[in-house]
Amino acid sequence: MRLTAKQVTWLKVCLHLAGLLPFLWLAWAINHGGLGADPVKDIQHFTGRTALKFLLATLLITPLARYAKQPLLIRTRRLLGLWCFAWATLHLTSYALLELGVNNLALLGKELITRPYLTLGIISWVILLALAFTSTQAMQRKLGKHWQQLHNFVYLVAILAPIHYLWSVKIISPQPLIYAGLAVLLLALRYKKLLSLFNQLRKQVHNKLSL
């Protein structure tokens, strides 16, 4: 039985709640001592993990819609992607304001360059910013064939973000490995498309070097 448009609308409502409830929990934890001994790190890790969850959920939609024969599920993909960007922005903001502090924001650029895991993080965020900004149907029409080329960069984020997470923790625990494994699995489901994109990129580079 296929989902109807009305059911997908209610599913979107549930997904919005799924994006909002972690924020409400975090606000409660901050105000009621629900965080650990290092609340700043806890906030950074929580916001980062939540962004990663929404990234993985976004990547899950296409194969799920295909294998479950639920084409209308695709309508939830943009919503999940925007929540991913929102939580990634909270993650970046928590680092800038809580780790560095308002008086040391001038150091942000230096930190992003000198710490490789932060470099991967900011590259991922910039890509997500571009994808969020161009996610509307109006931008899709305006960009034409270039829209899909741009949005294929989500696969690069799926590689960089788990590495950023693994690199940022001092002690490797099962959790970041699980996220990395899920990202690899979701990318593996698209191996034909990724191989095609890689071959196209290699051909373009070869043509430019041959000039």
From Swiss-Prot:
Membrane topology: Multi-pass membrane protein
Superkingdom of source: Bacteria
BP-aspect Gene Ontology terms: protein repair
GO cellular component: plasma membrane
Keyword Electron transport part of the UniProt annotation: yes
Subcellular localization, as worded in the UniProt entry: Cell inner membrane
InterPro entries assigned to the protein according to its UniProt record, in alphabetical order: Fe3_Rdtase_TM_dom, MsrQ-like
Record key words, sorted: Cell inner membrane, Cell membrane, Electron transport, Flavoprotein, FMN, Heme, Iron, Membrane, Metal-binding, Transmembrane, Transmembrane helix, Transport
Pfam name, any one: Ferric_reduct
GO molecular function: electron transfer activity; FMN binding; heme binding; metal ion binding; oxidoreductase activity, acting on diphenols and related substances as donors
Cofactor stoichiometry and binding remark: Binds 1 FMN per subunit.
Chain segments annotated as transmembrane: 10-30, 82-102, 116-136, 153-173, 178-198
Keyword rRNA processing: no
Main location: membrane
Essential cofactor(s): FMN; heme b
Subunit note: Heterodimer of a catalytic subunit (MsrP) and a heme-binding subunit (MsrQ).
Similarity comment: Belongs to the MsrQ family.
Function per UniProt: Part of the MsrPQ system that repairs oxidized periplasmic proteins containing methionine sulfoxide residues (Met-O), using respiratory chain electrons. Thus protects these proteins from oxidative-stress damage caused by reactive species of oxygen and chlorine generated by the host defense mechanisms. MsrPQ is essential for the maintenance of envelope integrity under bleach stress, rescuing a wide series of structurally unrelated periplasmic proteins from methionine oxidation, including the primary periplasmic chaperone SurA and the lipoprotein Pal.
Protein name, entry field: Protein-methionine-sulfoxide reductase heme-binding subunit MsrQ
Primary gene name: msrQ
